[in-house]
């Protein structure tokens, strides 16, 4: 009796041979479609625009940071500089307290003392200026409330009205800012003062 399982496992049985598997062609999921060149060109242009915007923002940030650092260096000493001005004022008051006649007739000791005070004042002002703090004297200029504070009026028809004719206390700038306005006396009674050509008080340092 013939076992049917033997014929099924017979390698020479042509019915057992499997049919060949035909693979389908592989298609890339991102294969470009017809007419997509314009879309890619648009995407490239948008990417370039974003890159340029990012670079511009980075450059603006760099400039802003540099400016903030410079301001911090310049104006970080504002409080200290304002306190030091009291010392400069006291030195100036000490010199102003000595009459010109006394100076002319002073002995060697007093002259040496006066010269020492003058040297100290100059050294202090030079140190302040090295750190961006500059003294200004607006005498003869048109009164400007941005840089000066009027303490009183001086009747004087010989000069244009609104002209600074006396300085009670010198002003100081720190960088481009007013550290302390000058205390001044302003003329009254003359012709109206002409507009100032420039309000840059730092150019009138004493």
Swiss-Prot record:
**Keyword Transmembrane in annotation:** no
Q: Give the GO biological process terms.
A: protein folding
Keyword match DNA damage:
no
GO cellular component, as recorded: cytoplasm
Region: Disordered, residue numbers: 1-38
Superkingdom: Bacteria
Q: Cite a single GO MF annotation.
A: protein-folding chaperone binding
InterPro entries recorded for this chain? GrpE, GrpE_coiled_coil, GrpE_head
On assembly, the entry states: Homodimer.
Record's family? Belongs to the GrpE family.
Q: What functional role does this protein have?
A: Participates actively in the response to hyperosmotic and heat shock by preventing the aggregation of stress-denatured proteins, in association with DnaK and GrpE. It is the nucleotide exchange factor for DnaK and may function as a thermosensor. Unfolded proteins bind initially to DnaJ; upon interaction with the DnaJ-bound protein, DnaK hydrolyzes its bound ATP, resulting in the formation of a stable complex. GrpE releases ADP from DnaK; ATP binding to DnaK triggers the release of the substrate protein, thus completing the reaction cycle.
UniProt-recorded name of the protein: Protein GrpE
Phylogenetic lineage: Bacteria, Pseudomonadati, Pseudomonadota, Alphaproteobacteria, Hyphomicrobiales
């Amino acid at each position: 009796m013939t076992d049917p399982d033997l014929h099924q496992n017979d390698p020479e049985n042509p019915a057992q041979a499997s049919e060949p598997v035909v693979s389908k062609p592989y298609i890339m999921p991102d294969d470009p479609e017809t007419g997509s060149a314009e879309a890619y060109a648009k995407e490239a242009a948008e990417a370039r625009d974003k890159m340029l915007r990012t670079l511009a923002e980075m450059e603006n940030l760099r400039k802003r940071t540099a400016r903030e650092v410079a301001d911090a260096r310049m104006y970080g000493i504002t409080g200290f500089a304002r306190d030091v001005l009291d010392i400069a004022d006291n030195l100036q008051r000490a010199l102003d307290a000595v009459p010109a006649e006394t100076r002319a007739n002073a002995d060697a000791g007093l002259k040496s003392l006066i010269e020492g005070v003058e040297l100290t004042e100059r050294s202090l002002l030079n140190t302040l200026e090295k750190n961006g703090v500059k003294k200004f004297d607006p005498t003869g200029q048109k009164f400007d409330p941005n840089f000066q504070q009027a303490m009183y009026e001086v009747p004087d028809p010989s000069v244009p009205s609104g002209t600074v004719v006396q300085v009670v206390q010198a002003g100081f700038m720190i960088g481009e800012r007013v550290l302390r306005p000058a205390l001044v006396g302003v003329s009254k009674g003359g012709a109206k003062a002409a507009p100032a050509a420039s309000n840059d008080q730092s150019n009138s340092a004493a």
